[in-house]
Amino acid sequence: MALEMDSKNSNSAVTGDAAAATTKTNKAKENNNLAGSKKNQSQNLVNGNGTAADGPATKKKGKKNRNKSPPVSTDEAALSNGHVEEKKPEGDGDADADANANVVAVKDEKAEGGDGADAAELDTEDIDLDALHDAGIHVNISCPGSELLTVQLSSMELVQEIHQLLMDREESCHRTCFSLQLDNVTLDNFAELKTIEQLESGSTIKVVEEPYTMREARIHVRHVRDLLKNLDPADAYNGIECTSLTYLNTITQGDLLDKKKTRPDSVDCTPPDYVTPGVFEPPLLPLHPNFKNAKGPQALKVLTTSAWNPPPGPRKLHGDLMYLYVITMEEKRYHISACSRGFFINQSTDDTFNPKPDNPSYLSHSLIDLLSHISPSFRRAFQAIQKRRTLRHAFERVATPYQVYQWAAPNLEHTVDAIRAEDAFSSKLGYEEHIPGQTRDWNEELQTTRELPRKTLPERLLRERAIFKVHGDFVTAATRGAMAVIDGNVLAINPGEDSKMQMFIWNNIFFSLGFDVRDHYKELGGDYAAYVAPRYDLHGVRVYNAVDVEGLYTLGTVVIDYRGYRVTAQSIIPGILEREQEQSVVYGSIDFGKTVLSHPKYLELLRQAGKHLKILPHSVYNERDEPVELCSSVECKGIIGNDGRHYILDLLRTFPPDVNFLKLQEVKLSTELVEMGFPIEHRHKLCCLRQELLEAFVEDRYVNFIRIAAVHLQQLNAKKPEETQSEEKKQLPAIEEAEKENKENLNVNETPNEKEKDTPVETKNAEAMVNAIREAQSNVATSNEIQAAEVVKQACAAVGSMKEKEFDFRFNPDVFSPGIRHVDGEEGTSGSVAKQKLLVQDAAEFLVVKQIPAFVKEHLSHSSPPIDGQNLTESLHSHGINVRYLGKVIKALGQMPRMDYLYRIAVMELIVRATKHIYYTYMQSTDPMHLSVAISHFLNCLLTNGPINPVVSNDEMHKKRGGNGGKHNKHKSSKGGKGQQQPAINQNGGSTTSSSSSANAYDWTLVTPRSLWQQIRKESKAYWDWDLDCDSMDSAMSKFGIMRICLLRAFCLKVGIQVLLREYNFDSKHKPTFGDDDIVNVFPVVKHISPRASDAYNFYTTGQAKIQQGLFKEGYELISEALNLLNNVFGAMHQENGSCLRMLARLSYLLGDAQDALAIQQRAVIMSERVNGIDNPSTILEYTHLSLYSFANGHVGMSLKLLYRARYLLVLTCGEDHPEVALIDSNISLILHALGEYELSLRFIEHALKLNLKYFGNKAMHVAVSYHLMARTQSCMGDFRSALNNEKETYSIYKSQLGEKHEKTRDSAECLRLLTQQAVLLQRKMNDIYSNGKLTSDLPPIHITPPSMGSVLEMLNTINGILFVQISQRDIVKVRSEIEKRMKANTDVNEAIKSMVAAANNNGESEVLAPQDNNKEQAATAQQLTNGDKVAVSS
């Protein structure tokens, strides 16, 4: 199970194909784990991987000769255990948003001591990984009819892993029904290898064919079908079985590591037309290159179950299990019997049943062997399929953790497939034949995994892996169930009620629809509130899960948007269906505060969680006017299940309300906010602040707290009262000045020069504060405790702390909830309702006044610019800014010319979201028989101005059914899915129709482009308080530069539409752009929680800190270990694994190993394509990194192809006007220049220069580099005059920014001298020709030396932010000691404050809720350090 096995030594160790195991058979075996006994539960829940980090990966201590390659150095070894282990489908991806919760949780644990186990592992130096790494054993495996096979396994693996391995190897993949025997004793599938006494290195395990049962025969047939369609991308396009697409192999035409270096003169470097600068609307077809040839050879025409099934009684007694029907490529038809000994041809025909064996009879234990025997075409095709399958990269064959859906798909041939048909029946749950006891008790599984022990690292890995697997299965089942509910395949538990009020149970999961049932949300916004409540509830579940308090349980929760409906799927609390909710709830309120209950155990558990989540315990009056203490919002309900567990649910108000979007009598907002248009009355009253905002707000207050404490500490230690007074006079203005400086720094209109000027002032202020505290610290221990307490008290009062003598910032989530009567405490204390309200107001003001300007300022440097709406949303969320502030963000961006691209992305995101609100209403009132016509009509109205002619089929079926065709088109809602108040028809100039369903079912035909854009405009004003000022797609294009193809992509991904892969003519004047055949599918948009891998995260962040200090090798080792742990928890395929791979590739490159970098980055690209999507922004960035490493390895042509792909995807996503396009164009230009394609090179660099001037200004370093590249290219073309002008620009920028003596300025001056020389020479020759009058004679050749590949690579590194610089050992020691000094000073600040507060609070027993201070800024300056004298710096 070698995760960190050196690829050079792994020939015998790594066993072949690395079990991709994407078959349901293997899923079945995994699921069996869950059915095991309690005794083996911890082992069984974690499929196949026993406890931990697989293989002889490196130890943290005592291993000096660690491999430099990352934990995964061969494709086969890469996949978790040295053999790929199947990853089950797990939900979709708010992964980044969820990661924020994880980060915050970890930070909180650090700040507050955590809960023991989690705090302990933060110091990676203290973790001994010996427990996870074992030497492994070599085992021989003997298969019937095959050579002896030798594999290396970890002693911690389960026997089942060997099953997985054999089922994926080419020679044994067709075997499913076998046992493994050692010395004639059958091994238990769920036994760890180390528990088998007779097993030792060199032992031979024998594969023994077992008799089939009905279940095993079905599994075998399914496995054969999966092998035959292994290359078929249909499942990936249809979004099933956790398959997804990757096109890296298609673009590189094979493994990059197998390529030979290319000579520059042999490279075909002409870019496709759609990649050259100036293309406005990129084509759609190149998104899926070569999809026509992806399917592979056909082995059989038909393989299906026979209509003669099941075997009659007499044949059952002869051992018949089932009958199959096959048509071979030779057009021969066979009826096949499956019996306990294998498969044989029988004598049945389509009309006659004759189950006796055919003559001559041939019995085979494997169906593949039998089919190969009767059909030569099958034998050839199967071999070809197997060969192509084994040539694919291992990462292409593993199932992804979450289903990735494609927004564009080609026309797929629909083939006969009995197994697919069988899976589609609603009675099927997907795993009946695999699990004892049939349906799974999801709640029990989810809670049991959380109860697993977590004290040691192996235990935590086991627990997190179990949580991840069960959660993934639950998300898949919930998604499938939600689709079945909306499609009308599930019977409601209350079928007699109105369809909007119906609830469903399927597969032990409870489903409810996003409508206001029984006026529950009437006071809060009705259907609008009911629609957003599940999303807020999911946020609550996420943060409570991240805090992970032992004994406190949340429900498994998934929110699915499908066909215009929002469905919430939840696991079921044991016993809750047996009694009324009123009887179940022991904590909280079921009627928004009218009746309130409390419970001591819940108070204890929620108080623990509240420390991390900054929730203030508070008291409210119940219906009997008795005070009741709560440690959560009133809506949070506590129910003790029949299993004795304490569950909390309805966590939609976990965080305090956002008063900027509530019109409240008692709230007076600041003048600044009122001028900006606040408060805005939102359409529901559930608006909450984000956890990230509260963290930032508390951190901001903590910085002020330290500042003020520093001043008072200095005063406290002054020797004379007079000195104290004078110091106060000096210091307080200094503090005010510092605060003023901070405010100025957040001014978004500052120029870069102003920003640079401000920085030294900040530094001086910080240094002054550090010195003050260090001086005070020397005496603080002997200070009078009363005086110390006074210092703390003053600092607390100044920053508005909830407690008088402690830094304590916690929020009351109920403080503005209507109908709740609070118990008011003394004024100025934490119990004071006025003080609680003020704090929530301050946090909301902080969002607008500080966080939005900070967000804009952060993106002014364009260091990691958002590429699409999803990127933008993630960035907003990381700053704690809710998307409802998007209108305000757009206004801020609109004042910044250099933020044009982000302004456009934000406007497009707003249009997409507004359109989504309208679309959901539109879909709910559409007859299922008209869905494709209705969707295509909607897209025509949104994206085109051509003829709109919705054609409704008038066949008899439609007439008979009227408009009430589907189960859920009856869910008529006036809410517009959180969109419009009126049905679409009322806003199209038509009259209001009757409310009959038949009339409503045709509302969609009345929508026109004009009416739709009017609705979008109205929605943008109502929801975001921003006037779109567009009445058509054309006006949006001309005003904002939005491309229709970008808008189509964004909208399809947002609402779950799959369109046909073809070129769309948006300007067609004769027929609509979209027809009903262009809508291929609709898919669910799934929101869920991503479980975390806490230890891996801690290794990763520690590794990053080491890298920032310049300790690349140490950082590399830590991040390698993080990847090791991630492989254990998540398996081979996961977004976080991809982040680790990208970092390891970059580190390998910086450490000088370009080949290693290429191997790792190739895996990172494939992983990103598969888990994020083929056109995801992350994938685009991975492609650009891979192109650099390809060039460094001599694959010049391949590097260009990768850049062309990246550029195409980037333009398809956000258009050409983007800083990232400038970077890619600079790279392309430089490589084309190296290949002598000067004219092409010039086109790309001119475009890059134009963008760099626009976004960085005419004095930026990016612009200087672009001018220099242009000069190089023009000089090679002989245009010395232009080259000279451009190099002069470069020189002037370097001179003004870096000074005359800087190396770059001197290089540019030298370049100018050479260009001037060349220009003079050329002019002389021209003059000679003219003076001689020989105009007809040929010009003498100009000697131009093309650049060397080394100089091109150096320039590529510069463009991509990588510098290699020479530093002497003395310099390294000097800089490092300076950094250590700074870090110590920073630590001293913390120590001073802690000791001061401890003194003030009785021997340090108080809880100081302070955010974690970090040394990132100090560490960043250490980036140039390393252990050698040549160093790489990555910026």
From Swiss-Prot:
TPR repeats lie at residues 1096-1129, 1222-1255, 1257-1290. Residues 58-67, 959-975 have a biased composition (Basic residues). Residues 420-662 form the Clu domain. GO terms for cellular component: cytoplasm. The modification Phosphoserine is found at S266. Residues 719-731, 752-762 have a biased composition (Basic and acidic residues). One of its GO terms (biological process) is mitochondrion organization. Keywords: Cytoplasm, Phosphoprotein, Repeat, TPR repeat. Residues 38-50, 1417-1435 have a biased composition (Polar residues). mRNA-binding protein involved in proper cytoplasmic distribution of mitochondria. This is Protein clueless.
